[in-house]
């Protein structure tokens, strides 16, 4: 996973 994706994924998933 990448920096931009981590923030977007964690923010949207959690």
Swiss-Prot record:
Its EC number is 3.2.1.118. Keywords: Glycoprotein, Glycosidase, Hydrolase. It is an enzyme of class 3 (hydrolase). The lineage of its organism: Eukaryota, Viridiplantae, Streptophyta, Embryophyta, Tracheophyta. Monomer. GO terms for molecular function: prunasin beta-glucosidase activity. It catalyses: (R)-prunasin + H2O = mandelonitrile + D-glucose. The keyword Hydrolase applies. The keyword Glycoprotein applies. Glycosylated. This is Prunasin beta-glucosidase 1.
């Amino acid at each position: 996973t990448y920096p931009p994706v981590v923030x977007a994924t964690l923010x949207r998933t959690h």
